Amino acid sequence: MGSSQGSTLSADVMSLVDTLPVLAKTLIAGGAAGAIAKTAVAPLERIKILLQTRTNDFKTLGVSQSLKKVLQFDGPLGFYKGNGASVIRIIPYAALHYMTYEVYRDWILEKNLPLGSGPIVDLVAGSAAGGTAVLCTYPLDLARTKLAYQVSDTRQSLRGGANGFYRQPTYSGIKEVLAMAYKEGGPRGLYRGIGPTLIGILPYAGLKFYIYEELKRHVPEEHQNSVRMHLPCGALAGLFGQTITYPLDVVRRQMQVENLQPMTSEGNNKRYKNTFDGLNTIVRTQGWKQLFAGLSINYIKIVPSVAIGFTVYESMKSWMRIPPRERSKPA
C-alpha cells in the first residue's frame, strides 16, 4: 500500500511538472543546481574569502591552517558562516543565469545575428546571462561576503589601527548587513564592488558556457546525458574561466569589506576609487601575488562546484522533461 501511495504521489508530481512552461522548469533546474553546488563547497568558499580580504590572523596561513583556525574560532558551523546568504543569493542567481542563457541563446539564433550557430553564441549568451544574474542578486552577494569575513574570536573585535583601536562592525544576519549598507551608502552602498564583479563575470560566465558546450560537442551522442560526461566538462569549464578572471574577484571582495577595515590616514576606509584603481593599489601595496590569494583553494572549490552545478542542471532538465534546445526553440 505504501508503495502504491508513493507511486501515486510521484505520478502527481510529474503531472504537475509537465504543466509548467519550459522557462519555469529551467528556473527550477538552475536554482537547484546552484544551491546544491554552493553548499557542497561552502567551507572552501569561506576560507577563500578570508584569504582574499587579508583578514587578520589569516594573512600568512595556508588552506589547511586556515581551516583549523576557523574550526577553533567558530566551531564546525563556522565553515558555513555566510552560506545562508550565499544560498539565498545563489538560488535566484543560478536560476536566472541558466534560464537567461537559454533565452539569450535562442534569441540570438532566432534573429540570425552574424554570430553563426557555434560556440560564439554560447560565449555571448553566457556573458549576457551572467551580467543579468549579477545585477539582480548583487546585494545578497555583498551580504554573504560581509558575513563570511567575520571571525568570532574576541581578539578580532578590537584591532590596532592608524588611529588607535578600531572596532570591527559585526552583523547578526543578512537583514542587518543590507540595512547597514543602505544606511551608509544608500542604493549605491548595496552595490559596492559591482564594477569588478561585472567586468569579471562577463568573460567568466561566457567562457564557462563556451568551454562546456564546446567540450560537449566532442562527446558521442550516446553519452551526451551521462553524468560522467557532465562532471569533467563542467570542471574544465570552471577551471579555465576562473583562472582568467580571478584578480577581479579579489578586488571585488576587498571592496565589499572596506567598511570593516581600519580607517586610513585620510580618515575613511574607502581604499579604491574603482576597479582599475583597486588592481593598481593592491599590486603597489600588497604585491601582485595578492591578486591570486586563495587561488589554490579556488581551484579545489571551483572544479567540484561547476562540475556539480552543470551535472545537477542537466539531470534536473532530464527529470523535468525539458525538451532539447532544437525542440524548445520558437518555430
From Swiss-Prot:
- What are its GO biological-process terms? mitochondrial coenzyme A transmembrane transport
Subcellular localization = Mitochondrion inner membrane
Task: Enumerate the transmembrane spans.
Answer: 16-36, 79-99, 123-143, 193-213, 231-251, 292-312
Which keywords annotate this record? Membrane, Mitochondrion, Mitochondrion inner membrane, Repeat, Transmembrane, Transmembrane helix, Transport
Q: Which Gene3D superfamilies match?
A: Mitochondrial carrier domain
Which domain of life does the UniProt lineage start with? Answer: Eukaryota
Q: What are the ranges of the Solcar repeats? A: 21-107, 117-218, 225-319
- What would be one Gene Ontology cellular-component term for the protein? mitochondrion
Q: What is this protein called?
A: Mitochondrial carrier protein CoAc1
The species this protein belongs to is: Arabidopsis thaliana (Mouse-ear cress)
